[in-house]
Amino acid sequence: MSTDPTSKPAFPITDEVRHALAVTKRGVDELLIEEEFAQKLAKSAATDKPLRIKLGLDPTAPDIHLGHTVVLNKMRQLQDLGHTVIFLIGDFTSLIGDPSGRNATRPPLTREQIESNAKTYFEQAALVLDREKTEIRYNSEWSMPLGADGMIKLASRYTVARMLEREDFTKRFQGGIPISIHEFLYPLMQGYDSVALNADLELGGTDQKFNLLVGRELQKQYGQEQQCILTMPLLEGLDGVEKMSKSKGNYVGISEKPTDMFGKLMSISDVLMWRYFELLSFRSLDEIARFRGEAEGGRNPRDFKVMLAQEIVARFHSQADAERALEDFNHRAKGGVPDDIPAVTLAGAPLAIGQLLKQAGLVPSTSEALRNIEQGGVKIDGATVSDKALKVDAGEFVVQVGKRRFARVTLTA
């Protein structure tokens, strides 16, 4: 079927359609092709038939962080406009491993890892999406039955030259870095998902653009109306430099405790705060612009950071949790010890300070403990520890690492 708008009857672009298009475009990096999507929206409004909106996520890790919610928020906005959202769990494509943005082959996950991670994926995503209006699918439904014959036929629809147009593949090829054949299959399988689901729009991060376009091309080859493409920006992590990633430690998990989530959000820079407002807040753009004007006019940016942190904590927990998190944050800022810190009993006194911090669960390793001591970030009963060779005697005390990690330690011989 041709996707040339001139070959199909044009549907009227009403105020309702213009509003839906404006909602769709908020905060996006790119919408391809906007004129086509406007017609899809117009047709949907005229025929009262919802669009099929696809988002695929590979369960490569068990937890979803705020970076993932940028695209989930957009899905919810489209859902609220009345469209069908398809939350696609890439249990088959996870066996391949997405090479997007990689400079080396990504190790595929085992079936056991995938199944374990997938269990918690939608439960967390449902904190953003409307569970009752979400279609949950697994791409193994249609990918596994393909078999060798079907896979060969699918592979014949795309050339190696086209695959090498992708920037990360090009860099690896030119740099003599190996590219495995199975990595070429990933964009094809993701694209085939769009054929199987007959998607009208597919969402993804900016690093997914090539894969999304493969889906559009395959739909054309299979005689379907081509999906439009919507890419969302990658959210910077707490450091404001690299994209949010659990492996980089610069993330905020959506299942974290309210106090931890609030504290992490309050740690971001004033500049990064506005980026988070744009991509994570449900407030109107006009309201955010007004906040920014007030900050530029002299109002303390901390006021707006508190609003942002409370909004996000309330979304994933409750308004009461957000209020308590603010109280806890203010208490800590004044040098107070939180009421809900964990109690830990350790043995082996006198115990090296690095071991104590690790065994108390305050740091992942002794080397991390020593780094925190060097930076003046470790306190025992409020006194800063400066001696990395310190041996801690038996007793009861409160240990603090950084601004947010506390433990009430009982150390015995």
Curated annotation (Swiss-Prot):
Assembly description: Homodimer.
Root EC class: ligase
CDD domains: S4, TyrRS_core
Keyword Acyltransferase: no
UniProt name for this protein: Tyrosine--tRNA ligase
Domain of life: Bacteria
Keyword Ligase: yes
Domain S4 RNA-binding: 351-411
